[in-house]
From Swiss-Prot:
InterPro entries assigned to the protein according to its UniProt record, in alphabetical order: Ribosomal_uL14 (IPR000218), Ribosomal_uL14_bac-type (IPR005745), Ribosomal_uL14_CS (IPR019972), Ribosomal_uL14_sf (IPR036853)
Signal peptide positions (record): none
PROSITE patterns: RIBOSOMAL_L14 (PS00049)
Name recorded for this polypeptide: Large ribosomal subunit protein uL14
Key words, A-Z: Ribonucleoprotein, Ribosomal protein, RNA-binding, rRNA-binding
Subunit structure: Part of the 50S ribosomal subunit. Forms a cluster with proteins L3 and L19. In the 70S ribosome, L14 and L19 interact and together make contacts with the 16S rRNA in bridges B5 and B8.
Amino acid sequence: MIQMQSTLEVACNSGARRVQCIKVLGGSHRRYAGIGDVIKVSVKEAIPRGKAKKGDVYNAVVVRTKKGVRRPDGSVIRFDRNAAVLLNANLAPIGTRIFGPVTRELRTERFMKIVSLAPEVL
């Protein structure tokens, strides 16, 4: 469950390390974002010589949350930290590698690239 001001770690090699959610996209009064939702983020911490610089604003898709995601069979998949993958204007990932597991809920037409790059799909 990600809301405005939430900090997330970045699960790709775009150069950003930590980002802060500045807007949940998809409705004028939408408060929370879950796994698979697109948010607007600001880069708070970045590595030198990376594509993303501190202060840059990007779209990002949430790939892991502490709140987790509930499956139709009743099981819940939770993670230790909140994480996102930075996206460009066309909603394609900026980085060329994805770190850590992602969930099957990302297997939509929009995010198949992220699922194919991920080392593990839960």
